[in-house]
From Swiss-Prot:
Highest rank taxon of the organism: Eukaryota
Region of interest: Disordered: 1-43
Organism listed in the record: Dictyostelium discoideum
Protein name: Uncharacterized protein DDB_G0268276
The organism's taxonomic lineage, starting at the top: Eukaryota, Amoebozoa, Evosea, Eumycetozoa, Dictyostelia
Record's compositionally biased regions (Acidic residues): 20-35
Length: 43
């Protein structure tokens, strides 16, 4: 319904519709989780 530009991790992409927004939110959560797991695995 509405088009908005979201910046995450230096990546720019257009999201339209609530469905896309939900997917974007999940991606951000996954990225954060991965970042936390990365140092743990390295350590």
């Amino acid at each position: 319904m509405f088009k908005s530009r979201i910046e995450t991790g230096g990546f720019q992409f257009q999201v339209h519709g609530d469905d896309e927004s939900a997917m974007d939110d999940e991606f951000i959560d996954d990225d954060d989780d991965q970042q936390v797991v990365e140092p743990v695995t390295d350590n």
